[in-house]
């Protein structure tokens, strides 16, 4: 069973992530994780924090000489600004007079609409929102990306799976493409200022961001994640919690500010007749023995992969920390107030796409291990080869008939 957890606050000393259940023998290095953390910083409309957050990381367990050892993989990512926050965010008690003298420790009593601020204060009985926003911050996703890199390398080394993402809409601007990007397109996407596939809509997306910044506003958007190389049979139709589409949706919805998930052309299919919604099946030569005329299902049927590329989309709402503050209530005085503004991005949609890749990788790695088992990469690979050999054998028998 693959499990993972993160800990740490946005302005604490560090973030920590632990991945348990990964097989031994997966090749991964500090440099591999650092490269993915750099990708997480990509995108037009970033906050100044992205420019100075160094993401200094250390693998503190589970990897030796560039290979996983079968034990929990633990990663620590230092927060660059910790020295400025050492007293405000200290784990041990600090002299109240010292805290009172610190501007950074001013109570945050004007919760932001759309943020976890108020609901978290009500749930945990806090008098201000600092304890909520520190953990609710999307800074936490850096820890997810760290352990997700291990999952991504496992999938690539076991099955040749490649996962990529791109921005399909930003604010009111949609990217213009009539086909999916492939693994060879990833570098071009990462080099694009808004991580769009193709340049047709890039300038309009950037203009949308600039306009929002000028107005003191923020933007949301939609990202798409595609996984190539998955064999049929990952996931299950048998139980609700084993359905791969359900697990993917839950994982993507766990990303900060994600408010909707679509598998394949799910929402468009809701407006079509069945004859125009489903992917017809045709005979084909070779080990797959069938082919699809389309991939509107996004590679999943009945909660199981069907051999087509896996395609999922996630909708991200606009960031809730706006320079043009929204109306709120001061929780101390009970009087109307303007919501506080923390330093934030104008849009985090391009970065959210990279985080979405991470969540897809973690879910797929767990499902693949459930399907094939094993304690080491070579053992799991043998199990995969046996399964694929069985698929080929059945395909050959059908073709002989």
UniProtKB/Swiss-Prot annotation:
GO terms for cellular component: cytosol. InterPro entries: Chorismate_synth, Chorismate_synth_AroC_sf, Chorismate_synthase_CS. Its EC number is 4.2.3.5. Pfam families: Chorismate_synt. This is Chorismate synthase. CDD domains: Chorismate_synthase (cd07304). Keywords: Amino-acid biosynthesis, Aromatic amino acid biosynthesis, FAD, Flavoprotein, FMN, Lyase, NADP. NADP(+) binds at residues 40, 46. Belongs to the chorismate synthase family. One of its GO terms (biological process) is chorismate biosynthetic process. The lineage of its organism: Bacteria, Bacillati, Actinomycetota, Actinomycetes, Pseudonocardiales. Homotetramer. Reduced FMN (FMNH(2)). Pathway: Metabolic intermediate biosynthesis; chorismate biosynthesis; chorismate from D-erythrose 4-phosphate and phosphoenolpyruvate: step 7/7. It catalyses: 5-O-(1-carboxyvinyl)-3-phosphoshikimate = chorismate + phosphate. FMN binds at residues 135-137, 256-257, 302, 317-321, 343.
């Amino acid at each position: 069973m693959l499990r993972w957890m993160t800990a740490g606050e946005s302005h604490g000393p560090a973030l920590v992530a632990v991945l348990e259940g990964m097989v031994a023998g997966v090749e991964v290095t500090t440099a591999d994780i650092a490269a993915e953390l750099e990708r997480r910083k990509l995108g037009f409309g970033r906050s100044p924090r992205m420019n100075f957050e160094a993401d200094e990381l250390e693998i503190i367990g589970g990897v030796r000489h560039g290979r996983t050892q079968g034990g929990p993989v633990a990663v620590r990512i230092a927060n660059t600004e910790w020295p400025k926050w050492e007293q405000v965010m200290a784990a041990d008690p600090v002299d109240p007079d010292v805290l009172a003298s610190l501007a950074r420790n001013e109570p945050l009593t004007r919760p932001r609409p759309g943020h976890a601020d108020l609901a978290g204060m009500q749930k945990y009985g806090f008098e201000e929102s600092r304890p909520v926003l520190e953990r609710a911050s999307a800074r936490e996703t850096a820890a997810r990306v760290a352990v997700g890199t291990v999952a991504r390398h496992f999938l690539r080394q076991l099955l040749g799976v490649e996962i990529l993402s791109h921005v399909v809409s930003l604010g009111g601007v949609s990217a213009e493409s009539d086909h999916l990007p492939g693994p060879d397109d990833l570098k071009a996407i990462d080099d694009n200022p808004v991580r769009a596939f193709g340049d047709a809509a890039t300038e309009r997306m950037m203009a949308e961001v600039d306009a929002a910044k000028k107005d003191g506003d923020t933007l949301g958007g939609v990202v798409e994640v595609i996984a190539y190389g998955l064999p049929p049979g990952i996931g299950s139709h048998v139980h609700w919690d084993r359905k791969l589409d359900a697990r993917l949706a839950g994982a993507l919805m766990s990303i900060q500010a994600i408010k909707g998930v679509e598998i394949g052309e799910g929402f468009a299919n809701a407006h079509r007749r069945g004859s125009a919604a489903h992917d017809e099946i045709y005979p084909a030569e070779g080990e797959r023995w069938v082919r699809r005329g389309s991939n509107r299902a996004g590679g999943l049927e009945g909660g199981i992969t069907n051999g087509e590329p896996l395609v999922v989309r996630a909708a991200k709402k606009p960031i809730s920390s706006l320079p043009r503050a929204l109306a709120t209530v001061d929780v101390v005085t009970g009087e109307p107030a303007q919501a506080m503004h923390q330093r934030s991005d104008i849009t985090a949609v391009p970065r959210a796409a990279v985080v979405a890749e991470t969540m897809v990788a973690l879910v797929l790695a767990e499902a693949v291990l459930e399907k094939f088992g094993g304690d080491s990469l070579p053992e799991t690979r043998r199990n995969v080869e046996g399964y694929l050999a069985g698929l080929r054998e059945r395909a050959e028998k059908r073709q002989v008939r």
